[in-house]
Curated annotation (Swiss-Prot):
InterPro entries: ALB/AFP/VDB, Serum_albumin-like, Serum_albumin/AFP/Afamin, Serum_albumin_CS, Serum_albumin_N. The gene is AFP. It is found in: Secreted. Dimeric and trimeric forms have been found in addition to the monomeric form. Cu(2+) binds at H22. One of its GO terms (molecular function) is metal ion binding. Keywords: Copper, Disulfide bond, Glycoprotein, Metal-binding, Nickel, Phosphoprotein, Repeat, Secreted, Signal, Sulfation. This is Alpha-fetoprotein.
Amino acid sequence: MKWVESIFLIFLLNFTESRTLHRNEYGIASILDSYQCTAEINLTDLATIFFAQFVQEATYKEVSKMVKDALTAIEKPTGDEQSAGCLENQLPAFLEELCREKEILEKYGHSDCCSQSEEGRHNCFLAHKKPTPASIPFFQVPEPVTSCEAYEEDRETFMNKFIYEIARRHPFLYAPTILLWAARYDKIIPSCCKAENAVECFQTKAATVTKELRESSLLNQHACAVMKNFGTRTFQAITVTKLSQKFTKVNFTEIQKLVLDVAHVHEHCCRGDVLDCLQDGEKIMSYICSQQDTLSNKITECCKLTTLERGQCIIHAENDEKPEGLSPNLNRFLGDRDFNQFSSGEKNIFLASFVHEYSRRHPQLAVSVILRVAKGYQELLEKCFQTENPLECQDKGEEELQKYIQESQALAKRSCGLFQKLGEYYLQNAFLVAYTKKAPQLTSSELMAITRKMAATAATCCQLSEDKLLACGEGAADIIIGHLCIRHETTPVNPGVGQCCTSSYANRRPCFSSLVVDETYVPPAFSDDKFIFHKDLCQAQGVALQTMKQEFLINLVKQKPQITEEQLEAVIADFSGLLEKCCQGQEQEVCFAEEGQKLISKTRAALGV
């Protein structure tokens, strides 16, 4: 059973069961009930995002037809209604339009959804979303001459097509983020069309946009996967921690209010409710900016930006400084009160306030580390109040909570030490060996992609100051592991990976760190084909040569996951000797055929395969 179902997180679920319950039980009104929308809404672009994300293979013409029909079916609000507040949620109308398009749904394999009830139908369409559909090619930067002409002739249609292309390639990317990057792309085009070297301008500036889009898409998909697999409670626990770290001067009641509404917005965004995702996000940002004097002095410049720009700016803004007079630790936070005598509601509030107070004191820690500390603290209290001396038990136990931080620090020190010693490429090779042993069922390209990100994380985070290193490393590892878990959900890897992915969000990374070798894996029969070497090894350079060497490394470990470090070093030394000998000779292909076979025989004998 997931630890997030413990009392520690029940209070968070209570916040989101309904806005009425939240307001009645805690006396806190939701921001989303009171704030008005301030920005003009382009329903055509929003509807385009919706239909392109839900039927990714549909052509632009097909999506445009669905958009037109859906918007025609929606009653236009009067001027008074429009100015008085926000548009109503149009999700049901969009889903109805999807189901009216029987030919399109049949064509792309979505027709099974419309026979279900409203909620089931929605979930069915969500399940059809694919992060990287094979039928859709990577986005290519448009040819400048044609693009500039099309943009000048009909800017609105040109930008709507761009939104369509982005949405279908990134089905989990939040609508406001798509609109934000579309707006930035809209600014790039006129300047690049006038540039002396338009091709270079487009390639350079558009490459930045597409890179940021990919990264934003990964983050949004990760957030949605956490909410789906671990529930709203876990997501809200994450949000409590992040907001308390960012807004260190804010009291617990205000954090509660923000947690409710931030999680509510993410839920809309993850379910493809494009209108509520946009409007409710705007409300929260408007509220935060209206309260910036009390929330944080780090967001002043953010609040001067457009509504779309504010969100990204605030999210990436620095944490506020710790308030003066804040005690360095939370020793005896409970005091002499008997935790086991608390009512369920009292326990909820107390533990929530502990998370808030701990987070604002430790902005340098990763969210997952703080959640591990919080779980440990709950278990400590439950244990101590069954002893004769609860206070003494607490004092000893609170020192033990440091083990969660120390484990994270030790991992960071070890990883950065290896990075300094080996460099990024050889560190990736070390990760390759470790993760091929943990998950030999992954393809070579998957293993290389995962470990490349891990090595890049070390290269980035190990350059940071100590107060930023831990959060950087653990945070990046959480995203990388999260996407491995999304892959496992689609195509199961092995029981060990499955256990780590599903048992506990907070403990996912330590769980993966503790995996060594997948004992359920049965290596395939030895095949010489995977170890045949050719003269192209001598011709390859840079990344191409590194990739070939890594393929050899992966195949070797997959053949014998229990291979020792000494055995591995010996085989690699022999392989390097083979390259040196054959690449210096005239008859390279003959050399590889003869000497390569000797290497294979020697390796098989040494490994017993």
